[in-house]
Design a protein with these regions (language model features):
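N-terminal hydrophobic/helix-forming segments and targeting peptides
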Residues: 1-432
Length: 432
């Protein structure tokens, strides 16, 4: 198998092991540990030296990996790649069991982010997330991660015979229509703790010890390749776990030993990044400051280091859809397999400008990768991403990029094998 093929198979495995943000971070931890990175606690005293490789997590759903360079950050700046661990999905609400007529037990859910709702219907779903158990005292609950590997639930459509407008853009109620079926119950069955008992059995703990949970639905169908030559990737959470995988691959294979390298994986980008583990928080800036000071610098050195730094903010872009050409800019519509996209917006929704885009194009040329421009159709509003949020926290130059995907925010998105391999090459070039 070629190394480039290994990158794709590694991505598929990574996606299957990462059904939600918490499991994605746990999978990243395992990859980093296997490549010589040591875990630190965020509240440990920062003691590092040149050549150290370490990581720490925030809220179990964000992770920051660092390779300390031989030279002072004030002289070289930091090289940073940012991505995010979360994807649109359904979260399970507290007190979630809803018994109904016909003896059907459903779970009460809440929409996280902006998923394409219709894509979640009529497919096998299961549970993943974290569970908080009683600990040694009230301030120290114990965290357990959970991933139920078997199909547990299904969100079922109403038959077309009862809804003739279903194929005509019939609107959905998130509260009524998107509740998954979990079990068949009878009158004598105690249903109120069905979910907690299920979770307790999976974790082999007592249900009474469960204090709370963050549980999400996920599609149990595995990531796969398709196309005449297996050139396409079909999977959930390509946005943005494919960029997480590329960033972590790049830092574990990095050749630059002089500059300090950082892979920053934030959470909650899909809901605005306004959490303690999101890009709006000071967590990255605080870590960089502590790094500079641990290496003998001061606040002046920190300011110089950040100003001399460069960041690649990696979040997927919209690929050109041949069925809907009118939705795209007539001259800047990236295609699957055409290479990483540089995101540009006249109203500064992205951190890219001509200078930072030129740097990324040079990295692409050095890596032997094609590149594309992504610009929104002028009559179609686009989304935002990590870049501009982070520039509100750090005085840093950077570029917003991402690989093109179709059906962004669907339960299964479509990407390109070549694009993923090329993005890894470019990120490795940045870290070389």
């Amino acid at each position: 198998m070629k190394k480039t093929d290994k990158y794709v198979s590694s991505l598929l495995e990574f996606l299957d092991n990462s059904p939600c943000n918490f499991l994605a971070v746990d999978t990243v931890k395992k990859i980093l540990t296997a490549n010589g990175f040591k875990e630190k606690k965020i509240d440990d005293k920062m003691t590092v030296k040149a050549g150290d490789k370490f990581f720490f997590t925030k809220n179990d759903s964000a992770i920051f990996a660092v390779q300390v360079g031989k030279k002072k950050p004030a002289d070289t700046g930091f090289k940073i790649i940012a991505a995010h661990s979360d994807s649109p999905c359904f979260r399970i609400k507290p007190a979630s069991e809803i018994p109904g007529d016909g003896g059907i037990l459903r779970l009460n859910t809440e929409v996280y982010g902006g998923p394409i709702l219709y894509t979640w219907f009529d497919r096998p779903l299961s549970l993943a997330g974290r569970v908080l158990l009683k600990g040694k005292d009230a301030l120290h609950p114990v965290t357990k991660l959970i991933k139920v590997d078997r199909p547990l639930m299904c969100i079922s459509h109403l038959a077309i015979h009862f809804n003739r407008a279903v194929n005509e853009g019939n609107p959905l109620s998130k509260q009524k229509d998107m509740l998954p079926i979990l079990a068949k119950i009878n009158r004598d069955m105690e249903w109120r703790n069905t979910l907690l008992n299920l979770v307790a059995d999976e974790l082999q703990v007592e249900a009474d010890d469960i204090l709370d949970f963050d549980l999400m639905l996920y599609d149990v169908n595995k990531a796969n390749l398709f196309g005449l030559n297996n050139e396409f990737i079909s999977a959930g959470r390509l946005d943005d776990l494919s960029m997480v995988h590329a960033a972590i691959t790049a830092i574990t294979e990095a050749k630059d030993k002089n500059a300090t390298l950082v892979a920053a994986i934030f959470d909650n980008e899909e809901t605005g990044s306004g959490t303690k583990q999101g890009a709006h928080s000071p967590v990255l800036g605080n870590m960089l400051l502590r790094l500079v000071m641990a290496l003998g610098g001061d606040f002046e050195d920190y300011g110089r280091a950040v100003h001399r730094s460069f960041m690649i903010s990696a979040d997927n872009a919209h690929a050109f859809h041949p069925n809907y050409p009118e939705k795209y800019d007539p001259t800047n519509h990236p295609s699957l397999g055409g290479g990483p996209c540089i995101k540009v917006n006249a109203n500064c929704k992205y951190m890219s400008d001509a200078h930072s885009a030129a740097i990324f194009k040079s990295l692409c040329e050095g890596a032997g990768s094609p590149f594309q421009n992504f610009v929104n159709h002028s009559d179609v509003a686009g989304g935002s991403t990590l870049g501009n949020i982070l520039t509100g926290q750090l005085d840093i130059e950077g570029v917003d990029v991402g690989n093109p995907v179709l059906a962004m925010h669907s339960v299964r998105e479509t990407g390109s094998c070549d694009d993923h391999v090329n993005m890894i090459k470019v990120m490795k070039q940045f870290f070389s």
